[in-house]
Amino acid sequence: MAFNFNWSPLMADASFYTRAQDLLTAALNKSPKPPIIVDDIHVTELNLGSIPPELEILEIGDLAEDRFRGIFKMSYTGDAFLTLKTRVQANPLNTFLLTRPTFGSPVPLAAATPLTIPLQITLSDFKLSGFVILVFSKQKGITVVFRNDPLESLKVSSTFDSIPFVRDFLQKEIEAQLRILFMDELPAIIHRLSLRLWVPEYRTGEEMNDETDNTAKSSEGPGQDPLASPPQDPVDSLGNALNESEIASLSLDSSVETHSLFSQKNLLRLAALTDSQRTLSLFTPSIQEVVYRAWTSPTDTSEFPSSVISPLSPTLSREQSQMGSMSSLHETASNASMQSRPSMSSHSFSTSTYGLSLGAGRHSKAHARKRKKRVVDLRRPKTTDDAMSVSDESVMTESSRPPSIASAPLPIVNEPSDDPVTPPLSPEVDCHLPIIPERHLPSFSRPTRRDADLSYSHETIRGPKAEDVDATPRATMRGYPQERAEAGPSSNQRTPLPAAVLPFSKDENANVDPVLVDRLAGEIARRMREDKLMTNACSGFWSRQHEDSPPPAYGH
């Protein structure tokens, strides 16, 4: 398969060269130029030469009468040349200062004087080699895409060939610009030229656009005064609207000039610009009740106190800040205690209520309470009244606190409260028996003071009771009081113990061996010490085996 490329019509068509020169001029001025070039680049001469490029067909994708698509290997070493004209800056100091900021430059007086010299550059001896994707269509023209950089070398001849430094500089800069031209701009130039040659509609449209541009350029005269004709909504200098009769009565000789008429819309925009944050934008959002430092002088600063604030940044008063922080702190503490100790829901309820109702003052009662050591009470309460008895301080805190607005109504928890609770005491009886601790529920409370006569609780001589299902230790904030207020009606109505069970009652006829009493007291003290040592040595009271057998009673 052979192809015949007719290169001579391109050389003979003058209109083709004119159009190609215009396209090349636009392409060379489109890309950013080096600062040494101070004028536009004009293509004054273009010649494709008599030697056509050599094409080697690598692949044909589509072949028809009106379309073609293929891949070629192109190589060109011909006599085409291109002549350019421009103006360059001969003073390098001027070029250096133009590319540096003014505040950092020395600003010389005479050494930086610009010196522009006309420059003529001729590009010749092109050597091209590369792979070309060619797509031809009579309706869409020719599309040429280079897969690689086709420029191998070229010769640059200029006015400064006698200066080696300038010659080398121009050679390097022009080669860089031509590589960009071949990869980006040349395919678009070839496509537009092909449309002008083969598509009549495109040619007609371009001719009409050229005529329109020429007419617009010729009709342009001196600038028209936009204020010569009155605006649509005229107002005077004071902002008062003017009607048509007032406008018609105005003349050039009158005291009110026509140029003093302004549009209401323009006045609003000027007012918005004045009220903006010293920016050039007409739509800068304004912030109410804000005093800007740039607006006030040092004398005006004292007139505006610091209390002038923006609604977007409200004042953070001490009460609001303290209420938010303390309430969140107490809520966090209450949640942590709720998760770690399920049986202390009543305590966490009171803690969260206390945190929600904060904010009445900076120094609340929580800071006034003394830190007390928590005492664990493992004895099961006798009655509901004793178990739910609360200390006077806790009751006063809960009852005297006013309801907070921020606190929402919370459900009532029926579980036994873990707030400071006064442990139930044994009923006051006339018997004085030594205390024998329960072996299946060891107590971790601090040892209270005992009199010389150790009182013996009647719990030790009762029958074994059912084990406590809830093994969670019950805590209290204070030890056993020495003197206890009279108990509830349930504790006062307990059945007195029979006389046979109380051998140590104050009876003159009772004969008790004091040696036996001392021996039993020593045995009880030894057992208490052993239990305490075992409790401290073991991992906890959870692993201890419950012993349901009560200790032996005295006198039996």
UniProtKB/Swiss-Prot annotation:
The keyword Manganese does not apply. Residues 375-385, 459-468 have a biased composition (Basic and acidic residues). It is a multi-pass membrane protein. Residues 299-333, 391-402 have a biased composition (Polar residues). Residues 362-374 have a biased composition (Basic residues). It is found in: Mitochondrion outer membrane. GO terms for biological process: mitochondrial genome maintenance; mitochondrion-endoplasmic reticulum membrane tethering; phospholipid transport. Its main location: mitochondrion. The keyword Transport applies. Transmembrane segments: none annotated. Disulfide bonds: none annotated. Residues 334-357 have a biased composition (Low complexity). Residues 206-239, 299-423, 440-473 are annotated as: Disordered. Lacks alpha-helical transmembrane segments, suggesting that it resides in the membrane via beta-sheet conformations similar to those predicted for other outer membrane proteins and porin. Component of the ER-mitochondria encounter structure (ERMES) or MDM complex, composed of mmm1, mdm10, mdm12 and mdm34. Component of the ERMES/MDM complex, which serves as a molecular tether to connect the endoplasmic reticulum (ER) and mitochondria. Components of this complex are involved in the control of mitochondrial shape and protein biogenesis, and function in nonvesicular lipid trafficking between the ER and mitochondria. Mdm34 is required for the interaction of the ER-resident membrane protein mmm1 and the outer mitochondrial membrane-resident beta-barrel protein mdm10. Belongs to the MDM34 family. This is Mitochondrial distribution and morphology protein 34-2. It comes from Penicillium rubens (strain ATCC 28089 / DSM 1075 / NRRL 1951 / Wisconsin 54-1255) (Penicillium chrysogenum). The lineage of its organism: Eukaryota, Fungi, Dikarya, Ascomycota, Pezizomycotina.
